[in-house]
């Protein structure tokens, strides 16, 4: 029997780690941050030097980034990714949470991947209006790996691909959790929430702005009419 002896390091082996971009998309509550954390920890176990970057305006968890079930990991806050370029060049793996909020996400990820870094981005793909969120979708053609996760619809328990805002705010960037957003399916996306229904009802109230005030006034007038009737008799 003959054996083939292969060298431990092949001549064609790269001299440094090859860079790549991995993108994790999906609605809120679909497990994007959990998957980002899992991938980063996998590299940490293999003794790679890792850095996680979080959006600085999300101050809910101090200097950590957190999943919705309160698993946390140390993170470097930033509003612009270019502000943490030096820190990023000193590591092998870069994790970016809430990538949709960073206006320079595309240029930064491409630059770091070309420097041999593994860049893992977790981001919302769409706004509460189901429109592209910032420039995050421009990262898709540049990425080696793209996955879109789904959540469970918080109104009917089917598969959920969208994020629905519960309040009446119109601006795109409103940071919050289950108090402000639901993950929903296509059918439930078009159903009005209780807050939206209350808001539309208030617009139709010509005299009094608060629900229930008209009922109080009617009771008040009824009491006055009874008093007038009793005094007349």
From Swiss-Prot:
Xref: SUPFAM superfamilies: Glucocorticoid receptor-like (DNA-binding domain), P-loop containing nucleoside triphosphate hydrolases
BP GO annotations: DNA synthesis involved in mitotic DNA replication; protein homotetramerization; thymidine biosynthetic process; thymidine metabolic process
Any Pfam family hit: TK
Annotated catalytic residues: 98 (proton acceptor)
Annotated positions of the Phosphoserine modification: 2, 13
Record-listed substrate binding positions: 128, 172-176, 181
Protein modification: Phosphorylated on Ser-13 in mitosis. Phosphorylation of Ser-13 by CDK1 during mitosis reduces homotetramerization and catalytic efficiency when DNA replication is complete and intracellular TK1 is still present at a high level.
Binding site for ATP: 26-33, 58-60, 97-100
Any one cellular-component term (Gene Ontology): nucleus
Residues that bind Zn(2+): 153, 156, 185, 188
Reaction(s) the record says it catalyses: thymidine + ATP = dTMP + ADP + H(+)
EC number per UniProt: 2.7.1.21
MF (Gene Ontology): ATP binding; identical protein binding; thymidine kinase activity; zinc ion binding
Domain description: KEN box sequence located in the C-terminal region is required for its mitotic degradation by the APC/C-FZR1 ubiquitin ligase and interaction capability with FZR1.
Family listed: Belongs to the thymidine kinase family.
Further facts: Two forms have been identified in animal cells, one in cytosol and one in mitochondria. Activity of the cytosolic enzyme is high in proliferating cells and peaks during the S-phase of the cell cycle; it is very low in resting cells.
PANTHER family cross-referenced by the UniProt entry: THYMIDINE KINASE, THYMIDINE KINASE, CYTOSOLIC
UniProt-recorded name of the protein: Thymidine kinase, cytosolic
Species name: Mus musculus
């Amino acid at each position: 029997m003959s054996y083939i002896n292969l060298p431990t390091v092949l001549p064609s082996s790269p001299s440094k780690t090859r860079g790549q971009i991995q993108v994790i998309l999906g609605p809120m509550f679909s497990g994007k941050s959990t998957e980002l954390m899992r991938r980063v920890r996998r590299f940490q176990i293999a003794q790679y030097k890792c850095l996680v970057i979080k959006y600085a305006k999300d101050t809910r968890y101090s200097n950590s980034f957190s999943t919705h079930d309160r698993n946390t990991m140390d993170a470097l806050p930033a509003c612009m990714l270019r502000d943490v370029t030096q820190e990023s060049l000193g590591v092998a793996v870069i994790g970016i949470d809430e990538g949709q909020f960073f206006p320079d996400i595309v240029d930064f990820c491409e630059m770091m991947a070309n420097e041999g870094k593994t860049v893992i981005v977790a981001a919302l793909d769409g706004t509460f209006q189901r429109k592209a969120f910032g420039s995050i979708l421009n990262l898709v053609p540049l990425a080696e790996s793209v996955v879109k996760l789904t959540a469970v619809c918080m109104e009917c328990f089917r598969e959920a691909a969208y994020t629905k805002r519960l309040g009446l705010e119109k601006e795109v960037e409103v940071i919050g959790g289950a108090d402000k957003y639901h993950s929903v399916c296509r059918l439930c996306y078009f159903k009005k929430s209780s807050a939206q229904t209350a808001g539309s009802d208030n617009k139709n109230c010509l005299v009094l702005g608060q629900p229930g005030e008209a009922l109080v006034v009617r009771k008040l007038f009824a009491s006055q009419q009874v008093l007038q009737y009793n005094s007349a008799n």
